[in-house]
């Protein structure tokens, strides 16, 4: 005999379980074979010492291709293929003080947007300027780097372990050094690298900083496009050699005169071409909406327009939670909604294939390259780069100078990031010199302008200039600090504390003169 009540109860339970939203999980996936990663450290160092860009450039492009290889996983809700890089763990590896370290073997399929942290560096060269650019960012770490960040590391054999993903542990690490410890020894353990050998692919830690803009799901949306220093507002007066030397040249994306009308309604095979008057008129209301949100300081300065399909750059659709996170980053102007697109406009990429890491940075460059290929270009791109990836430019910094023994400094910056006025001499910078100054003190600073307090570890300034290479083993500004193996993520990504845990004084070497 059947029991109607029991049957009804079981049916209701089954329906509730079936209808309950499930957290989709993504498995972090390494770059597959075939993309020259990782390479031989000895060989790559020889290229860097000889400034052998004929070998460095294709290696960097193959790395770009490998990052965007199909992971075999999809974006939940859309079923669209997910590239390798987006399977990797992000800043969830830095848990709140009372929370356990997350499982690095999987991640939730969401993105934690925030403004680029270098725009708010706690030890800058001057007053922090509020950005007016419509971009967000986050960090990504390949499986080797994720394991490194979440495991304990002793400062000396047999000693206590310190965790590089928590501020209190980093402060304790810095405090335990004897007073006479040389600068070169006041450091975290090096991120992992294993050389390839017969029968072993090898491995190397990797960090990424993707930078994304918003494109509305059903509306063509303008996105600034870099056209060199001369392609920004008033560049003839603000970016002269004298103004550059005085750190007055900061052509941020909000000042760029060229914009691409990214059209989600255009066919995927539509060409990148000059926009028509009708297409330009179509985005005028959006531009007015964006600029009216910040009177007196334009967010978009478009005067020349391209028209591109959405397929011309990498993108994914945002969930409602991601749209909310996007809108919470204090971005003025357009507001994101579920289904809108986050489009990849830039990405910093660094790998532990060198002791000082390899450095390459990519930015969206539809159409022609910037004048004088500054600071980089699409030249030398390999056939492994396909699809939207071929619309990005790149520069590399495998050495601080253009070869060992050279006095000519490398210039390699990302136009979407290092043009910020909060970054000293960004248009003269290079990735290796900048990241080489990453370090933590034991003292904390409150970075909140109003309650509640957000206490973070103090760090040294970014380099004050790029006139000469830094000797990181003897750099005097590291007095009182522990260097973090060229990773600004280690000093920047741990969760802030609600109160100062130690009330220690700040180091003497904190800001640029």
Where on the chain are the PLM-derived regions?
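Bacterial N-terminal signal peptides that target proteins for export
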Residues: 1-9
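Conserved small-residue
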Residues: 20-433, 438-513
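Hydrophobic h-region of N-terminal signal peptides that target proteins for export
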Residues: 12-19
């Amino acid at each position: 005999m059947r029991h109607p009540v029991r049957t009804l109860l079981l049916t209701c339970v089954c329906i509730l379980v079936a209808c309950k939203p499930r957290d989709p999980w993504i498995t972090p996936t390494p770059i597959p074979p075939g993309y020259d990663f990782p390479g031989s450290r000895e060989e790559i160092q020889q290229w860097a010492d000889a400034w052998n860009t004929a070998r460095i450039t294709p290696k960097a492009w193959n790395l770009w291709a490998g990052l965007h290889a199909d992971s075999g996983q999809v974006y939940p809700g859309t079923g669209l293929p997910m590239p390798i890089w987006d399977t990797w763990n992000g800043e969830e590896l830095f848990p709140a003080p009372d929370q356990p370290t997350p499982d690095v073997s999987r991640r939730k399929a969401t993105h934690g947007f925030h403004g680029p942290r270098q725009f708010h560096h706690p030890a800058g060269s001057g007053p922090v300027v509020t950005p007016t650019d419509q971009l967000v960012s986050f960090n990504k770490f390949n499986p080797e780097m994720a394991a490194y960040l979440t495991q304990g590391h002793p400062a000396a054999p047999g000693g206590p372990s310190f965790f590089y993903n928590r501020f209190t542990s980093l402060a304790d690490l810095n405090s335990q050094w004897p007073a006479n410890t040389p600068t070169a020894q006041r450091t975290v353990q090096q991120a992992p690298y294993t050389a390839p050998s017969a029968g072993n692919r090898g491995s190397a830690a990797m960090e990424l900083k993707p930078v994304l803009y918003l494109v509305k799901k059903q509306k063509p949306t303008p996105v600034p496009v870099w056209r060199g220093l001369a392609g920004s507002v008033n560049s003839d007066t603000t970016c002269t050699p004298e103004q550059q030397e005085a750190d007055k040249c900061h052509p941020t994306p909000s000042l760029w005169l060229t914009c691409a009308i990214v059209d989600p309604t255009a066919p995927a095979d539509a060409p990148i071409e000059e926009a028509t008057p009708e297409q330009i008129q179509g985005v005028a209301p959006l531009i007015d909406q964006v600029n009216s949100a910040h009177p007196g300081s334009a967010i978009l300065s478009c005067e020349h327009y391209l028209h591109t399909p959405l397929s011309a750059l990498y993108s994914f659709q945002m969930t409602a939670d991601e749209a909310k996170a996007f809108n919470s980053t204090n971005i003025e102007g357009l507001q994101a909604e579920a289904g809108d697109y986050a489009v990849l406009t830039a990405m910093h990429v660094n790998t532990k294939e060198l002791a000082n890491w390899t450095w390459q940075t990519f930015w969206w460059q539809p159409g022609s390259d910037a004048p004088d290929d500054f600071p980089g270009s699409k030249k030398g791109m390999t056939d492994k780069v396909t699809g939207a990836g071929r619309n990005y430019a790149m520069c590399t910094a495998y050495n601080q100078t253009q070869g060992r023994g050279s006095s000519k400094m490398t210039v390699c910056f990302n136009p979407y990031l290092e043009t910020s006025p909060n970054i000293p001499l960004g248009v003269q910078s290079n990735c290796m010199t900048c990241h080489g100054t990453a370090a933590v003190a034991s003292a904390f600073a409150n970075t909140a302008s109003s309650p509640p307090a957000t206490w973070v570890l103090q760090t040294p300034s970014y380099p004050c200039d790029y006139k000469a290479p830094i000797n990181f083993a003897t750099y005097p500004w590291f007095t009182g600090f522990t260097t973090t193996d060229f990773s600004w993520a280690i000093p920047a990504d741990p969760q802030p504390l609600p109160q100062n845990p130690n009330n220690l004084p700040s180091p003497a070497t904190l800001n640029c003169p």
